[in-house]
Amino acid sequence: MRPAAFLDRDGVVNVDFGYVRHVRDWQWMHGARAGIGWLKAQGYWVIVVTNQSAIARGLATEPQVLALHDWVLAHTRVDAIYHCRHLPHDPCPARKPQPGMLQVAGQDFAIDWGRSFLLGDRDTDIEAAQNANIPGLLSAGDDWRGLVRDYVSRRTS
Protein backbone atom coordinates (compact mmCIF):
# COMPACT_ATOMS: atom_id res chain seq x y z
CA MET A 1 0.00 0.00 0.00
CA ARG A 2 1.11 3.51 -0.82
CA PRO A 3 -0.32 6.91 0.05
CA ALA A 4 -2.11 8.84 -2.68
CA ALA A 5 -1.75 12.49 -3.55
CA PHE A 6 -5.06 13.35 -5.16
CA LEU A 7 -4.73 16.48 -7.29
CA ASP A 8 -7.47 18.60 -8.76
CA ARG A 9 -6.79 19.34 -12.42
CA ASP A 10 -7.79 22.89 -13.39
CA GLY A 11 -5.98 25.37 -11.16
CA VAL A 12 -3.58 22.79 -9.69
CA VAL A 13 -2.08 20.77 -12.55
CA ASN A 14 -2.92 23.25 -15.32
CA VAL A 15 -3.85 26.91 -15.49
CA ASP A 16 -7.62 27.26 -15.26
CA PHE A 17 -8.69 29.12 -18.39
CA GLY A 18 -12.26 27.91 -18.08
CA TYR A 19 -12.98 24.82 -20.10
CA VAL A 20 -9.69 23.35 -21.31
CA ARG A 21 -10.64 20.93 -24.10
CA HIS A 22 -7.54 20.53 -26.25
CA VAL A 23 -3.80 20.17 -25.79
CA ARG A 24 -3.38 23.54 -27.54
CA ASP A 25 -5.38 25.13 -24.68
CA TRP A 26 -3.29 23.47 -21.95
CA GLN A 27 -0.77 25.40 -19.87
CA TRP A 28 0.96 23.69 -16.94
CA MET A 29 0.77 25.40 -13.56
CA HIS A 30 4.21 26.62 -12.55
CA GLY A 31 6.04 23.78 -10.84
CA ALA A 32 3.27 21.21 -11.35
CA ARG A 33 5.33 18.67 -13.27
CA ALA A 34 8.23 18.99 -10.81
CA GLY A 35 5.80 18.68 -7.90
CA ILE A 36 4.31 15.53 -9.40
CA GLY A 37 7.81 14.10 -9.83
CA TRP A 38 8.67 14.94 -6.22
CA LEU A 39 5.51 13.21 -4.96
CA LYS A 40 6.37 10.11 -6.99
CA ALA A 41 9.90 10.14 -5.51
CA GLN A 42 8.30 10.18 -2.04
CA GLY A 43 6.36 7.01 -2.90
CA TYR A 44 2.92 8.52 -3.57
CA TRP A 45 0.40 7.46 -6.12
CA VAL A 46 -0.42 10.68 -8.00
CA ILE A 47 -4.06 10.66 -9.02
CA VAL A 48 -5.93 13.53 -10.65
CA VAL A 49 -9.64 13.92 -9.80
CA THR A 50 -11.50 16.53 -11.82
CA ASN A 51 -15.03 17.78 -12.40
CA GLN A 52 -15.49 18.28 -16.15
CA SER A 53 -19.01 19.63 -16.60
CA ALA A 54 -17.97 20.92 -20.04
CA ILE A 55 -19.05 17.49 -21.27
CA ALA A 56 -22.60 17.81 -19.90
CA ARG A 57 -22.76 21.42 -21.10
CA GLY A 58 -21.90 20.32 -24.65
CA LEU A 59 -18.68 22.37 -24.66
CA ALA A 60 -16.45 19.30 -24.91
CA THR A 61 -16.95 15.68 -25.81
CA GLU A 62 -15.95 12.72 -23.68
CA PRO A 63 -13.40 11.65 -26.33
CA GLN A 64 -11.85 15.14 -26.26
CA VAL A 65 -11.46 15.03 -22.49
CA LEU A 66 -10.08 11.49 -22.58
CA ALA A 67 -7.59 12.42 -25.33
CA LEU A 68 -6.40 15.38 -23.26
CA HIS A 69 -6.02 13.15 -20.22
CA ASP A 70 -4.10 10.58 -22.26
CA TRP A 71 -1.73 13.38 -23.32
CA VAL A 72 -1.26 14.46 -19.68
CA LEU A 73 -0.54 10.86 -18.64
CA ALA A 74 2.03 10.57 -21.43
CA HIS A 75 3.81 13.78 -20.34
CA THR A 76 3.87 13.34 -16.56
CA ARG A 77 4.26 10.68 -13.92
CA VAL A 78 0.56 10.89 -13.01
CA ASP A 79 -0.77 7.40 -12.34
CA ALA A 80 -4.42 7.98 -13.26
CA ILE A 81 -6.99 10.66 -14.03
CA TYR A 82 -10.64 10.32 -13.01
CA HIS A 83 -13.27 12.76 -14.19
CA CYS A 84 -16.94 13.45 -13.61
CA ARG A 85 -18.88 14.74 -16.59
CA HIS A 86 -21.97 15.93 -14.71
CA LEU A 87 -23.34 19.39 -13.94
CA PRO A 88 -23.03 20.79 -10.41
CA HIS A 89 -26.71 20.19 -9.58
CA ASP A 90 -26.78 16.62 -10.96
CA PRO A 91 -27.03 13.91 -8.28
CA CYS A 92 -23.74 12.17 -9.03
CA PRO A 93 -21.68 10.42 -6.32
CA ALA A 94 -18.50 11.05 -8.33
CA ARG A 95 -18.78 14.83 -8.67
CA LYS A 96 -16.78 16.71 -6.07
CA PRO A 97 -17.57 17.48 -3.28
CA GLN A 98 -18.74 13.87 -3.22
CA PRO A 99 -15.89 11.37 -2.73
CA GLY A 100 -16.85 8.96 -5.54
CA MET A 101 -13.80 9.50 -7.75
CA LEU A 102 -11.50 8.94 -4.78
CA GLN A 103 -13.39 5.81 -3.81
CA VAL A 104 -13.09 4.38 -7.33
CA ALA A 105 -9.35 5.12 -7.23
CA GLY A 106 -9.25 3.18 -3.97
CA GLN A 107 -10.64 0.16 -5.82
CA ASP A 108 -8.05 0.53 -8.58
CA PHE A 109 -4.98 1.23 -6.42
CA ALA A 110 -3.69 -0.11 -3.09
CA ILE A 111 -4.01 3.19 -1.19
CA ASP A 112 -2.79 3.94 2.31
CA TRP A 113 -5.64 6.30 3.22
CA GLY A 114 -4.00 7.29 6.51
CA ARG A 115 -1.19 9.04 4.64
CA SER A 116 -3.16 10.32 1.65
CA PHE A 117 -4.39 13.86 0.93
CA LEU A 118 -6.15 15.93 -1.73
CA LEU A 119 -4.72 19.17 -3.12
CA GLY A 120 -7.25 21.49 -4.71
CA ASP A 121 -8.01 25.13 -5.36
CA ARG A 122 -11.72 25.22 -4.48
CA ASP A 123 -13.88 24.58 -1.46
CA THR A 124 -15.48 21.61 -3.25
CA ASP A 125 -12.05 19.95 -3.41
CA ILE A 126 -11.54 20.36 0.34
CA GLU A 127 -15.08 19.09 0.98
CA ALA A 128 -14.37 16.03 -1.20
CA ALA A 129 -11.28 15.33 0.89
CA GLN A 130 -13.32 15.64 4.09
CA ASN A 131 -16.00 13.35 2.65
CA ALA A 132 -13.28 10.78 1.89
CA ASN A 133 -11.84 11.21 5.42
CA ILE A 134 -8.48 12.51 4.24
CA PRO A 135 -6.85 15.93 4.68
CA GLY A 136 -7.49 18.59 2.07
CA LEU A 137 -4.87 21.18 1.15
CA LEU A 138 -6.03 24.43 -0.44
CA SER A 139 -3.71 25.78 -3.11
CA ALA A 140 -3.62 29.52 -3.64
CA GLY A 141 -3.36 28.97 -7.38
CA ASP A 142 0.39 29.39 -7.61
CA ASP A 143 3.36 27.04 -7.24
CA TRP A 144 2.08 24.51 -4.70
CA ARG A 145 5.29 22.52 -4.22
CA GLY A 146 6.24 24.26 -0.95
CA LEU A 147 2.79 23.69 0.53
CA VAL A 148 2.90 19.99 -0.31
CA ARG A 149 6.51 19.50 0.80
CA ASP A 150 5.77 21.16 4.16
CA TYR A 151 2.69 19.01 4.62
CA VAL A 152 4.45 15.74 3.72
CA SER A 153 7.46 16.53 5.92
CA ARG A 154 5.20 17.30 8.90
CA ARG A 155 3.37 14.01 8.37
CA THR A 156 6.57 11.96 8.22
CA SER A 157 8.49 13.60 11.07
Predicted segments — roles?
Residues 1-47:
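Active-site neighborhood of HAD-like aspartate-dependent phosphohydrolases
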Residues 3, 63-80, 89-118, 122-157:
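Asp-based, Mg2+/Mn2+-dependent phosphohydrolase catalytic module
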Residues 10, 53, 98:
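Anionic group-transfer/hydrolysis microenvironments
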Residues 12, 59, 121:
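Gly/Ser/Thr-rich helix-start
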Residues 12-16, 48-51, 80-82, 103-106:
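A short alpha-helix capping/helix-coil boundary motif
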Residues 14-16, 57, 127:
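Conserved protein kinase catalytic core
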Residues 22-29, 58-62, 95:
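Flexible, glycine- and charge-enriched loops at secondary-structure boundaries
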Residues 32, 36-69, 78-87, 129:
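Substrate-recognition element of Asp-dependent hydrolases with the DxDx(T/V) motif
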